[in-house]
Amino acid sequence: MTGEKASGGEAAGAPRRMLAQVLGHTLSVALHFLFAPRALWHGTAPMAEQRVYFANHASNGDFAIVWAVLPHALRRRTRPVAAADYWRGLIRRFVARDVFNAVLIERRREKRSEDPVEQMSVAIHEGATLLIFPEGGRSQGGVLPFKTGLYHLARLHPGVPLVPVWIDNLNRVLPKGEIVPVPLLCTVTFGAPIHLGDGEAKDAFLTRARDALLATRPTDEDCDGATEAEAAA
């Protein structure tokens, strides 16, 4: 009887999974068409290893763009960490959970039933790669000081590489309040991995991680090289 129930549950979930796959493919195609995002891999490569990607945050579309530029095999195992309050409602929650497989975090302490670091740590224990935004909110210029979550993940999972990711131009491609994209090149640059050093203090690590993210920003030569490489391909 138990086997029959499990089989029935799997059958009932099949249409939902199929819809999520179709919608995920459609979103990927749409994001590439609208924003033409390009991935630059500097100091690392798109490898099938568990990682924590940590990125700057200037737009609501940031994690979708990073998700879109990852190779399909890496995309399937990468879980973005996102604010639960933004992904409320039936459709948004379906997209977040079923399409992006996001780890949804409550930003307001009084509404939390789970510790955010514990939620992320469980996902890592389950084999997921995470995409997080350590600033904790969108910045309109520069990079805000990092919250402590990245440090706690580095301490709990010292063997997992932490890869800085710089998202460039997305806030200008689709300015706040606009619905028509501006034709600018959007790049996603992946930098050299870092780890928590032995005995490294929290503040020192967070400063070093922030500096690593800033150092990942692409130069004009990097973008020109990516354009030439794509044209040659």
Q: Which residue ranges define each predicted feature?
A:
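Catalytic core of membrane glycerolipid acyltransferases/transacylases, capturing the structured
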Residues: 47-108
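Residue-level preference for the first positions of well-ordered beta-strands
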Residues: 50-52, 129-133, 163
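Internal catalytic-core helix/loop-beta-alpha segment
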Residues: 102-143
